[in-house]
Amino acid sequence: MLKPSSLPSPLAVPGLLRSFLGVRLALPATYRKYSLTAPCPTCSVTRPSPKCWQSLSRRQFSKSPTILLHLSDTPEKPQNSSSTLEQSHQQEELKPDRDSNDSSSKPAEMVSPMGPKSKAEFTGSRSARATGGKAGRASKSDKLDAPQKLEPWQIQKQALKKKFPEGWNPRKRLHPDTLDVIRHLHQQDPKKYTTPFLAQEYKVSPEAIRRILKSKWQPSEEVIAERRERWERRHKRIWNQLAEIGVRPQRSKFADLSDTRILYGSRRTASSK
């Protein structure tokens, strides 16, 4: 018979039975995943897995379903385990609130490093800068608003703008024969050849047509003869200019009134004298 001291305790009997019968407890998935040893695929020797150093957080460990089931199955101290889990959950939930409260209270509790003297100096320098900037802007605006000294050509341009607000539009000078034709047409049919119609036809202002019809001046015979001579000379001079370019043929009777003859003839007469 066995001695009473060598008899196994009633708590060790279930463990011995399990070892003899080969029964294995169902470990949770977290224990399998983060176990300290992992079986090698080639041999039966166990080697440390690289995932063994990845420690579980308290929340993940406590919320795993297998662990909760295992804890519910154990009859020893069920009230203490549930109370500890609830306390851990409450502590984790209160942590972010404490952090947020600390972060919100920090800026309020911080004391400004600037003393009363430094604050006064800062405000004084700021006001001085503001006044200096305003003074600089005012001086620039005064310089821009001040009248600049105009050059002669600018003064002349302003005077021409005042004299001719619509721009340079010189009066059109009509030929004396055209003036006679305007008078003749208006005398024949005043209703048809009105002042606006004649102004549009000859491209002059109605005021100019009105003055032409109003005037009664007629040139004398001497003025008419002088005018014809002047027109003939002009005609010959223009003909000679076009002949030199090659547009018109040369004419010997117009050679005396050419520009070259007039220029060199005046020089020869001056040298002979």
Swiss-Prot record:
Keywords: Mitochondrion, Transit peptide. It comes from the Eukaryota. Residues 71-149 are annotated as: Disordered. Residues 1-68 form a transit peptide. Residues 77-88 have a biased composition (Polar residues). Its main location: mitochondrion. GO terms for cellular component: mitochondrion; nucleus. It is found in: Mitochondrion. Residues 89-101, 139-148 have a biased composition (Basic and acidic residues). Pfam families: Neugrin. Belongs to the RRG9 family. Required for respiratory activity and maintenance and expression of the mitochondrial genome. This is Required for respiratory growth protein 9, mitochondrial. It comes from Paracoccidioides brasiliensis (strain Pb03). The lineage of its organism: Eukaryota, Fungi, Dikarya, Ascomycota, Pezizomycotina.
